[in-house]
Amino acid sequence: MSTYLVFGATGNVGRRVAERLAWSGAAVRATSRTPEAAKLPRGVEVITPDLDAPGALDDVDAAFLMWPFHSAERARPLVDALRRRVRRVVFMTGGGTLPAVAPEEQPNPVARWHATVERLIERSGMGWTVLSPSTFMANTLWWSAQIRAGDVVRGAFGSLAVTPIHEDDIAAVAVHALTGPGHEGRRHTLTGPEVLTQAEQVRLIGEAIGRPLRWQELTPEQERARLLADPGFPDGFVGELLDGCTKMAAAPPPEVTSTVPDITGTPATPLSVWAAEHAADFGGDRR
């Protein structure tokens, strides 16, 4: 039986890819830095992300790959290892990577790293599919501490519009691309079903937890100071984040794509549903 290799299998998307494959009866090998704590479905083989380890790529037909590293220097040896044994790779890109734009011309460091990995995969000789998702709905968890503490979320760019996507919708498309025909050599742009500002997202979370919430606008400089004071936020990314938000706020609103329903046959999940699923994370009752 062919085996599917899932990288980042304890992350927001990788876990759901591994679960969906396992529930379908497929053989799954998943990578985790802490295999003993992975808590994946029974039958999933969990290994460390060391492709030089004996048996790591045995019988692997296709791989789901994401890139969590803060550089692209590990990409070439990883792609080289995959291309010697694996027929197909589905890569989840990120950072607002622009298609058909050279890595060095991408708009930010994260996009440059992801574009570098994309280029290596596309030139590897493997069958490939690139998934380019919009903002994860899970990113709203950045506000969870503020919401648990009160009824106001403070931040800059409250009018910034995005098309947030449920992580399980990304996973559903990934499984189709891993297991089905018609996806090789294609880039799938994935969005949720609606365009929402940050302030509107906060309102919908409030509705999900049964408590009115409101957005309080900060200036970019106030937001910079807030992020720099947050021990959980890397100082080196504060400037890049604010610059990126400034550019996004000045750009035309994003468009909703039909890729998720076109591929999966199921409508993309709205934020209201995701927020209800995660109500407990914001101090509400899980529904």
Predicted feature residues:
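Oxidoreductase cofactor-interface core, primarily capturing Rossmann-like NAD(P)-dependent enzymes
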Residues: 2-41, 52-55, 60, 66-76, ...
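A detector of mature, structured extracytoplasmic domains
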Residues: 44-45
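Cofactor-binding loops of NAD(P)H-dependent oxidoreductases
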Residues: 49
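An amphipathic, basic-hydrophobic alpha-helix
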Residues: 60-61, 265
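NUDIX/MutT-family hydrolases
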Residues: 217-219
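A hydrophobic C-terminal alpha-helical subdomain
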Residues: 221-287
